[in-house]
Amino acid sequence: MSNLKSLYSKMWIDSIDRFKNNNCDTDLLVNDSKDMRRGITVLSYFNDSVGAKVSNFLEELKIIEPEQYYYPKNELHLTVLSIVSCISGFKLSNIDVEEYSSIFKDSVKEIGGFKVKYKGITVSPSCILIQGFPDNEQLSHLRNFLRTHFNKAKLQSTIDSRYKISTAHTTAVRCTAPFKHCEAIMKVLSTYRDYDFGTLEVNSLELVFNNWYQNLSITKSLSKLDLNSSERYK
């Protein structure tokens, strides 16, 4: 956990001046119907309790800066691993869904449920993130099992091609336009810097086909597993 705290702290130090000085990178493809980037991801959606607290935080920001992109409550999620990073033109018909689902199930059969504590926020040059802290090494083991199984299967994948994921953060806001009220935004960010959003009990995982923003209007569930069910061992 100390490593994660240090990493999140470094992210904050490296990027918070961008928010103070209205110099954030902006994402111009949010809500662009021509954006055809698609991929395959293993994830877990937030429960109502954590989702509600994050949404309350986002509502405070939205009142000040309504032009930014705020993740809807039902789209907040923990990314376990990107199997195929979003590629322009990638289609579900490019893969054998049954093969991917089978590898997914084999990868997680020895993993039980785990918890992620969401406490505090940090920032990147273009986003506001909720800090996540797993309660044990299960998430790390899970990611390594997925990496090993998909690499052995030699199916199309781009695992770790952008970066090797090691955190449990959740993206909550994407900057899509210059800020109009930097000082007010900074006050809210400072208030929530160490805020306790609650604990996510990760009892199920999904393998999904998705776009860059994980919009549910585009997301298709390919396989879902209950981590606490004996049925997954059969």
Regions found by a protein language model. Name each.
Residues M1-K234:
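Histidine-dependent nucleotide/RNA phosphoesterase domain, centered on the 2H-phosphoesterase fold
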